[in-house]
Amino acid sequence: MGNLHTSIAVASICLTSAFLGCVFGLGFFVWIIYGYSIGGFFAFLSLFHLLEFYITARFQGSQLSWDSFILNNGKAYWLAMLVGLLECLLSGGKSFAKVINCLRFPSFLINFIFSVYQTSALGFLCLGQYLRSSAMVQAGQSFSHIVASKRNKDHLLVTDGIYAYVRHPSYVGFFIWALGTQMLLGNFVSTLLFSLVLWKFFSQRITTEEAYLVSFFGDSYEQYRKKVPSGIPLIP
């Protein structure tokens, strides 16, 4: 959106923050008071985008712009979220439960499995957000929402903290968080589709990004890659 230090850019950021804050508050209220999971979905979704901007402002200030909300995350991102919402609305939030019902389990077991599924959704959302935010904070100026094709002077190879356990904690975090959004909605089909599409996306992105990282850091990155997993299943 151009230079951050213009009245239009600042106004846009203020309005976007206010809008996301309202969505979070309303969604959280509907979720907690009325028990509608769709409210929780919007609360976690708006919080994610608010934190993307806040952490960028706090730890990657030189990169800050309206784009840091990553609301322009591509048509595929919003289409996927829309499909998830439609599945939830059409199934009454019981898509997963209906699939389990087809297995002819006893009703108490079906209720238990569905309860575990939705409880796991909260775990996925919180864990995913934690990993994503922690990765951005620990990487500092070395973090970027866009794959860097050229090394900047502030770009360092971060191998400690959360990066000592997985090479791409921000991707792992987003992967887990995105699955959590669909699990919270009680979706079955969208959860599977998200898993497949995100795996393919990150497989390609990691391959591209690591080619650049090897060119930036040479053998240091090669050795790091041998010792630490990517964090996403079936992606070495």
UniProtKB/Swiss-Prot annotation:
It comes from Schizosaccharomyces pombe (strain 972 / ATCC 24843) (Fission yeast). The keyword Membrane applies. Mediates C-terminal methylation of the isoprenylated C-terminal cysteine in M-factor. It is found in: Membrane. This is Protein-S-isoprenylcysteine O-methyltransferase. Belongs to the class VI-like SAM-binding methyltransferase superfamily. Isoprenylcysteine carboxyl methyltransferase family. The gene is mam4. Substrate binds at residue 205. Its main location: membrane. The chain crosses the membrane at residues 3-23, 24-44, 76-96, 108-128, 174-194. It is a multi-pass membrane protein. Its EC number is 2.1.1.100. GO terms for biological process: methylation; peptide mating pheromone maturation involved in positive regulation of conjugation with cellular fusion; peptide pheromone maturation; response to pheromone. The keyword S-adenosyl-L-methionine applies. One of its GO terms (cellular component) is endoplasmic reticulum membrane.
